[in-house]
A protein has these predicted regions:
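Sec-dependent bacterial lipoprotein signal peptides
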Residues: 1-13
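Bacterial lipoprotein signal-peptidase II cleavage site
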Residues: 11-42
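Sequence contexts marking disulfide-bonded cysteines in secreted/extracellular proteins
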Residues: 16, 65-67, 96-98, 149-151, ...
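N-terminal low-complexity, Pro/Thr/Ser-rich intrinsically disordered segments
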Residues: 33-65
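Amphipathic alpha-helical segments
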Residues: 64-82
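Short, solvent-exposed recognition patches
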Residues: 76, 80-138
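A short, solvent-exposed beta-edge/loop patch
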Residues: 126-197
Length: 197
């Protein structure tokens, strides 16, 4: 069960680069007109490399999880704001960032599809609708990762924001986060306060 998560973590790590200097963000017309995104852009980024702008498969919301939070907010989730990877590599349908701690991580990703795509589907058996931060969200686990990963998905404009809590070291990660879905919902409840509707 751990192998798919480890492969994913290694693939993400292999695609990341660290570039010295200040992080930059692209400005789009959608983010410059939306109050929540404008407020998000003012938070100091914990990224260490230039940040890619949204692409066709993930531009349905002006929200950018990679620059939406302060280091203190990220730290309050239990992960290290300095251990961040930008998952928005060229060619991927999703964009977002992953923050890590010893044995586990929190990723946030965006894709242009409705939250309802994650309900009543054989791909995510056992998915459930749940009110999260006042929004109609979905909580699900993938059979491919079993109980080593849990996702809380929230609607934002014409996209879905996924908050994924995953274990990459069973011994240390499971001790730190015994209930992945509870942590995913807890973080997603905070994320909901930042999302443009």
């Amino acid at each position: 069960m751990l192998a798919p998560l480890l492969v994913t973590a290694l693939a993400v790590a292999a695609c990341s680069t660290t570039t010295p200097g200040a992080a930059t963000t692209a400005t789009t017309s959608a983010s410059s007109t939306s109050t929540p995104a404008a407020a998000s852009a003012s938070a100091p980024s914990t990224l260490t490399a230039p940040h890619l702008p949204p692409s066709k498969g993930n531009d349905g919301t002006s929200f950018d999880p990679c620059v939406a939070y302060t280091a203190e907010e990220i730290r309050s989730w239990g992960v290290d704001p300095a251990r961040v990877v930008d998952n928005g590599n060229d060619g991927l349908r999703t964009r977002g960032c992953t923050w890590s701690a010893d044995g586990w991580s929190i990723a946030q990703s965006i894709i242009n599809n409705p939250v309802s795509d994650y309900l009543n589907t054989p791909v995510y058996p056992g998915s459930r609708a749940e009110k999260i931060g006042g929004l109609d969200g979905v909580v699900y686990q993938s059979p491919a990762t079993g109980d080593s990963m849990c996702t809380a998905a929230l609607p934002s404009q014409q996209a879905t924001v996924h908050v994924v809590v995953g274990i990459y070291n069973e011994k240390t990660g499971r001790k730190a986060v015994p209930d992945l879905c509870a942590r995913a919902v807890e973080v997603a409840t905070f994320v909901a306060t930042k999302l443009p509707k």
